[in-house]
Amino acid sequence: MSTLQSKDPKVFEAVQQELGRQRDKIELIASENFVSEAVMEAQSSVLTNKYAEGYPGRRYYGGCEYVDIVEDLARDRAKEIFGGEHVNVQPHSGAQANMAVYFTILEHGDTVLGMNLSHGGHLTHGSPVNFSGIQYNFVEYGVDKESQRIDYEEVRRLAKEHQPKMIVAGASAYPREIDFAKFREIADEVGAYLMVDMAHIAGLVAAGLHQNPVPHSHFVTTTTHKTLRGPRGGMIICNEEFAKQIDKSIFPGIQGGPLMHVIAAKAVAFGEALQPEFKSYGEAIIRNAKRLGEKLTSEGIDLVSGGTDNHLLLLDLRSLGLTGKVAEKALDDVGITTNKNTIPFDPESPFVTSGIRIGTAAVTSRGLDEEAMDEIGATIALTLKNVDNEEKMNEARERVDALTAKFPMYPNL
C-alpha cells in the first residue's frame, strides 16, 4: 500500500490501525470474518472502474464482456454450492436482497410473518424502525419462554390467524438449527410464500452442516460475508418462475450499476467454498462454538437455549449482574470484540441489553482450535467477573496478547 501511504497518509494510517486491531484483538462478533487475500485482491481490482447496468449479455453500457465473465462465474458457483434455478449476485447488501424480494411479491400494507428482533430476528424482518416494518404489516413470532427455541406451533397458530402473504424465516441471533421444512409446511397450509434469510448460516449450509433452505423456499436471501467468508454483499436465490421479477426488482428497481469488483470477490469466495477444505472449516466453526459454549457454561455463564448448533452463542448476563453494554466495553478493553445483544424477553432496552452475542467464524479462520476456545472462554469469564478489578483485567489482556501472538493474522499484509 505504498501508493496510498504516499498519496493519502491519513487514510493509510487509519487502514493500518484497523489492521493492527484485527491482528491484536480476538474477533468474536458473529457477523464478522476474515476474507482471504485473494478475495481482497479481487475487490481492489480494476473492476471497480466499470459501470455495468443490467445483466450479463443484456447491459446498458458497452465494454462489459469481461465483467460478464466474472458475474457468470459468481452466479454459476453459487448455484453449484446451494442449488436453486436462478441466482442474483448484484445486491449490495443482505438488506437490499431482502428488500428486492419484498418488492417482488408484496404490496404496501401486506401482512408478513417474521421473527421478533429481540428474540433473534433481524431489522429487515419487520422492525418498526426499518423500511420493512414501515411498509408492511409484520406480525412477529418468537421463541418459547422455557426452551428459548422457535415455537413452531406458535408460528402455525399466527399464520392461520393472520393469513400472511409471506413468512420470513432466518435470524441474526439464534443459536439453534432452523427447520426450514417445517416453515414450508406451515407456509403451504396458509398459501403463503416462504422467504429464508440465511445470512448468518450460509457458510454452514455451503459446507453441508445445516439444512439447506433452497429446496424448501420460494426465495432465499443471504449476505456473502459472515460464515460464507466473502466480501460484504448480498445474494438472492429463487426458482426460475420468479427470476425476471427478482432481477427487475434489483435493477432498475432499487439499484443502478452493480459493484463489479465486489461481485468478482464474491466469485472468488464461492470458488473457495466449493473446495473440500471449506467443509473442514465449517466443521471447525461448529466444534469451536460448542467447545466455547461448554467452557462458558462451566464458568457459570448462562447461554440462551443452553448452547448452540451453529457458529453463534448468546450469553445471558443477568446472573452476573451485568448488562450487555457494560460487558461489551469490558471485553473490548481486554482485547475481545463482541456486541451487546438483546435476549428473548429482555427487560433492558436495545441500547443496554442483557446479553452479548459471540461467534466463532472469524477466530476459526484465524486458526484457533478447541484448546484455544477453552482459553477464550476462561478469559471471557475472568473479565466479566472482574470488570472493576484492574489487576484481573490486566491478566485478561495478557492472555489475549498470548493468544493473538500464537495465531498471527494477515502476516503478509
From Swiss-Prot:
<feature type="site" description="Plays an important role in substrate specificity">
    <location>
        <position position="225"/>
    </location>
</feature>
<keyword id="KW-0663">Pyridoxal phosphate</keyword>
<dbReference type="InterPro" id="IPR001085">
    <property type="entry name" value="Ser_HO-MeTrfase"/>
</dbReference>
<protein>
    <recommendedName>
        <fullName>Serine hydroxymethyltransferase</fullName>
        <ecNumber>2.1.2.1</ecNumber>
    </recommendedName>
</protein>
<dbReference type="GO" id="GO:0030170">
    <property type="term" value="F:pyridoxal phosphate binding"/>
</dbReference>
<dbReference type="InterPro" id="IPR019798">
    <property type="entry name" value="Ser_HO-MeTrfase_PLP_BS"/>
</dbReference>
<feature type="binding site">
    <location>
        <position position="117"/>
    </location>
    <ligand>
        <name>(6S)-5,6,7,8-tetrahydrofolate</name>
    </ligand>
</feature>
<comment type="subunit">
    <text>Homodimer.</text>
</comment>
<keyword id="KW-0808">Transferase</keyword>
<dbReference type="GO" id="GO:0004372">
    <property type="term" value="F:glycine hydroxymethyltransferase activity"/>
</dbReference>
<dbReference type="GO" id="GO:0035999">
    <property type="term" value="P:tetrahydrofolate interconversion"/>
</dbReference>
<feature type="binding site">
    <location>
        <begin position="121"/>
        <end position="123"/>
    </location>
    <ligand>
        <name>(6S)-5,6,7,8-tetrahydrofolate</name>
    </ligand>
</feature>
<dbReference type="InterPro" id="IPR015422">
    <property type="entry name" value="PyrdxlP-dep_Trfase_small"/>
</dbReference>
<dbReference type="Pfam" id="PF00464">
    <property type="entry name" value="SHMT"/>
</dbReference>
<dbReference type="InterPro" id="IPR015421">
    <property type="entry name" value="PyrdxlP-dep_Trfase_major"/>
</dbReference>
<feature type="binding site">
    <location>
        <position position="241"/>
    </location>
    <ligand>
        <name>(6S)-5,6,7,8-tetrahydrofolate</name>
    </ligand>
</feature>
<dbReference type="InterPro" id="IPR049943">
    <property type="entry name" value="Ser_HO-MeTrfase-like"/>
</dbReference>
<comment type="function">
    <text>Catalyzes the reversible interconversion of serine and glycine with tetrahydrofolate (THF) serving as the one-carbon carrier. This reaction serves as the major source of one-carbon groups required for the biosynthesis of purines, thymidylate, methionine, and other important biomolecules. Also exhibits THF-independent aldolase activity toward beta-hydroxyamino acids, producing glycine and aldehydes, via a retro-aldol mechanism.</text>
</comment>
<keyword id="KW-0963">Cytoplasm</keyword>
<comment type="pathway">
    <text>Amino-acid biosynthesis; glycine biosynthesis; glycine from L-serine: step 1/1.</text>
</comment>
<dbReference type="InterPro" id="IPR039429">
    <property type="entry name" value="SHMT-like_dom"/>
</dbReference>
<dbReference type="InterPro" id="IPR015424">
    <property type="entry name" value="PyrdxlP-dep_Trfase"/>
</dbReference>
<keyword id="KW-0028">Amino-acid biosynthesis</keyword>
<comment type="pathway">
    <text>One-carbon metabolism; tetrahydrofolate interconversion.</text>
</comment>
<dbReference type="GO" id="GO:0005829">
    <property type="term" value="C:cytosol"/>
</dbReference>
<keyword id="KW-0554">One-carbon metabolism</keyword>
<feature type="binding site">
    <location>
        <begin position="349"/>
        <end position="351"/>
    </location>
    <ligand>
        <name>(6S)-5,6,7,8-tetrahydrofolate</name>
    </ligand>
</feature>
<feature type="modified residue" description="N6-(pyridoxal phosphate)lysine">
    <location>
        <position position="226"/>
    </location>
</feature>
<comment type="similarity">
    <text>Belongs to the SHMT family.</text>
</comment>
<dbReference type="GO" id="GO:0019264">
    <property type="term" value="P:glycine biosynthetic process from serine"/>
</dbReference>
